[in-house]
Amino acid sequence: MSGTYKTHRSRRSHAGAVRFDTKIAVLVRDDLEPWQRLNVTAFVVSGIAGAHPQLLGEPYEDADGTAYLPLLGQPVVVLEADADTLKAAHARALGRELPMGVYTREMFSTGHDEANRTVVRAVGRDDLDLVGLAVFGPKNGVDKTVKGARLHP
């Protein structure tokens, strides 16, 4: 899949909420500690934002004029899944050619980006010990990719 996806606002519902044609979904393993779930979520979503800067909204500013960084301009759904469901979602994302960020168990033992890439590169895609992933693409494709996962509590 090329990097040409853009977030399109498809329509407004009667309540005024914006609906999107694209979706960002994060899956985290259901056996992780809370701090690990948060860490994985932050890392994999940063990959989506880095690869697709058009997803970022405008910078924020408070009433005092203090500037803040832009955030993703569309919602992110965070889901949990067991190891088998996560592995299946990974395979479906690859099959659909959806942009994806991954986090493996080995990455918890590293201390920087180069080491993270090294531990991922050392394992074939079918043998990755995935503990999380983020996927972005057309809403229906993402929904089919994360089938079987549950909303994170």
Specify the residue positions occupied by each region the protein language model found.
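Positively charged, small/polar-rich N-terminal and surface patches that mediate targeting and assembly
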Residues: 2-153
